A protein has these predicted regions:
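Extracellular, repeat-based ectodomains that mediate carbohydrate processing or recognition
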Residues: 1-187
Length: 187
C-alpha cells in the first residue's frame, strides 16, 4: 500500500507499508523520496538510482517498526511542510477493537511521532449473518496539504464516528475542534 505527494517541481515522496494489516502483525511504515534520478532515504542517503530499481524494501529505513513495537500499522496520508519535509498520518492496531491515530513529522534529522488519539474500533458495518472481513478499516485521519499542522479525522465517540479538526503544535500539543456531534449516523 502506497501514498504519494510531490513538491510539484523535482521531488516525489512515497509513504508505504509492506502489506495489509489483516495479513500479518509485522506491517511497518516506510518513507522514501525520488529526486534527480535517485531514490533516497528520508535523511537524504541514496538507496539506488532509477536504473537500479526496484527499491528493495529491506534497504529502506522504517518510520514505524511494527516488529520492534509488536503492533501492526497502516498508512493514511502524506504531505510536505513549508520546509519540504514530509509529514505523515497512520494508524496502529493494538487490537481489532482498538485503533489509534499517529502523526509523524520529519524535522530534518529524525521523525517526531505523536499519538493523536484513540480512534475506536473498525468502521466496517457487518451485515446480519456475515463475518467481519475488514477489521482494520478506521474512520480515517488525513492532512490539510496546504498546512500539514492540521488533520481531519473520524473517531468513535460514544456509539458513532464523529469528525474532528485538530491543529498539531510544534511540541505535539493539540487544539481540538469538533466538526460533528451527537450524530445519528457514522461520519
Amino acid at each position: 500500500y502506497v501514498k504519494y505527494t510531490s513538491d510539484n517541481k523535482s521531488r516525489i515522496d512515497f509513504l508505504f507499508t509492506d502489506g495489509h494489516p489483516k495479513q500479518d502483525a509485522a506491517i511497518s511504515v516506510y518513507h522514501i523520496y525520488y529526486q534527480n534520478g535517485e531514490f533516497r532515504q528520508t535523511n537524504g542517503q541514496k538507496i539506488c538510482s532509477y536504473s537500479d530499481a526496484p527499491v528493495v524494501i529491506g534497504k529502506v529505513n522504517k518510520v514505524y517498526d511494527a516488529v520492534k513495537n509488536g503492533v501492526r500499522s497502516w498508512i493514511w496520508d502524506i504531505a510536505l511542510d513549508k520546509d519540504n519535509h514530509p509529514v505523515i498520518t497512520y494508524a496502529r492496531y493494538p487490537s481489532e477493537m482498538k485503533h489509534q491515530y499517529y502523526y509523524a513529522r520529519w524535522d530534518g534529522r529524525e521523525w517526531n511521532t505523536i499519538k493523536v488519539t484513540d480512534a475506536g474500533n473498525y468502521i466496517t458495518i457487518i451485515k446480519p449473518g456475515k463475518k467481519l472481513l475488514e477489521a482494520h478499516y478506521s474512520g480515517g485521519i488525513v492532512l490539510d496539504h496546504s498546512n500539514p499542522d492540521i488533520v481531519f479525522l473520524s473517531r468513535k465517540i460514544g456509539n458513532q464516528f464523529e469528525l474532528e479538526k485538530r491543529i498539531i503544535g510544534a511540541n505535539g500539543e493539540q487544539q481540538v475542534f469538533p466538526l460533528t456531534q451527537a450524530s445519528r449516523k457514522d461520519n
